[in-house]
Regions:
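An N-terminally biased module of ancient metal coordination in phosphate/nucleic-acid-related enzymes
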Residues: 1-109, 187-189, 193, 197, ...
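Generic structural signal for well-ordered alpha-helices
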Residues: 23-27, 82-90, 164-167, 199, ...
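Short acidic/polar active-site loop segments enriched in Thr and Asp
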Residues: 36-37, 125, 177, 273
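Acidic (Asp/Glu)-rich catalytic clusters
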Residues: 1, 31-32, 86-96, 116-125, ...
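Residues at the C-termini of beta-strands that transition into short coil/loop
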Residues: 103, 130-131, 279
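Divalent metal-binding pocket/active-site signature
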Residues: 20, 45, 107-110, 122, ...
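Charged catalytic cores and adjacent phosphate/nucleic-acid-binding surfaces used
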Residues: 1-11, 49, 136, 174, ...
Length: 305
């Protein structure tokens, strides 16, 4: 397996200092879990360089509880130095550790040219593109009363429409390589009765933009209760010729490589024979090797990818 979506820090206010020892520990944990390569992909919004350009973007939205919540979230998250982060991950890579330099880049409507300018000149291997926010509403914050009140106030079809519109613009921007947790709009467990039209739009957007799609195990930890993407969407990605990466979206060391066997089975069931790895933002195919590991416990056990 490749675990191509990993964060050094959990959410919330904390000391945001990247260290070589921390990256090395992630690599060691990955190898213990049978993960052959990882990508460190911290959130762009956690860095001061992004805050200098994008901070306050939510003020373009009408005053509301969700706008206030977004301001609080952003201010709690920011503080890391992008130059130091890049330096540390490159040092680990240069030392021969199985890691590539990445970043998770949120979608900012009408501002992706500003995002591209922030990223310009850094030697990233892979950039993940994510939609976590619809306007100032951080819809994936399912532990927040403010967020869930907004879910209650909106028709689920309208949420999925707005999400698909954002995916279209993100893909067409050409800024990112991989569509992270592609159907994150299901995070709260709320889906249209028949989501086919939205799945078709997501698959078409990824194919049109030349993006890979991420198969992300973190959905099993959410009310969605399944991986991102849903099996139907994964099948549509395969039919459209969209490559895939594999990921846990772990923010903690002990979740690196989590449920890799389940992810492998999803890939094989959808017809995939390889996953996408990246170097210098150039994609390469990494064959899927499906074989039980010594810790395989049968159904739901571990499978090598």
């Amino acid at each position: 397996m490749l675990d191509y979506h990993l964060h050094l820090w959990e959410h919330g206010p904390r000391t945001l200092e990247a260290t070589l020892e921390q990256v090395a520990a992630y690599c060691e944990q990955a190898q213990a879990e049978g993960v052959v390569e990882i990508a460190i992909t911290e959130h762009l919004h956690r860095f001061r360089q992004a805050d200098a350009v994008l901070g306050g973007w939510w003020e373009a939205e009408p005053p509301s509880a969700v706008r206030d919540a977004m301001a609080d979230f952003w201010n709690d998250e920011v503080g890391a130095d992008l130059d130091r982060y890049v330096e540390v991950v490159l040092a680990a890579k240069d030392a021969g550790l199985p890691v590539v330099l990445g970043l998770e880049v949120d979608f900012y409507r009408g501002r992706m040219h500003d995002v591209a300018a922030i990223l310009d000149g850094y030697p990233f291997d892979v950039l993940l593109g994510s939609v976590h926010w619809l306007g100032a509403w951080g819809f994936d914050g399912v532990g927040s009363d403010v967020v869930m009140a907004e879910w209650d106030a909106r028709a689920v079809e309208d949420v999925w429409d707005a999400y698909a519109d954002s995916i279209d613009e993100l893909s067409d921007s050409g800024v990112c390589d991989v569509l992270a947790h592609p159907d994150l709009c299901k995070v709260a467990g709320r889906r249209p009765a028949v989501p086919d039209e939205w799945h078709a739009r997501m698959a078409e957007a990824a194919a049109r933009g030349g993006m890979s799609a991420e198969v992300n195990s973190n959905g099993w930890r959410k009310p969605a209760a399944e991986a991102y993407p849903a099996p139907d969407l994964l099948a549509r990605f395969h039919a459209a010729g969209v490559p895939v990466t594999t990921a846990t979206d772990a923010h903690r060391l002990d979740r690196v490589g989590e449920r890799r066997g389940d992810v492998a089975r999803l890939l094989v069931d959808a017809g995939y024979e390889s996953v996408a790895g990246y170097r210098g933002r150039q994609r390469r195919a990494v064959p899927i090797a499906v074989a039980p590991t010594p810790t395989d416990g049968g159904p739901g056990g571990r499978v090598a990818v």
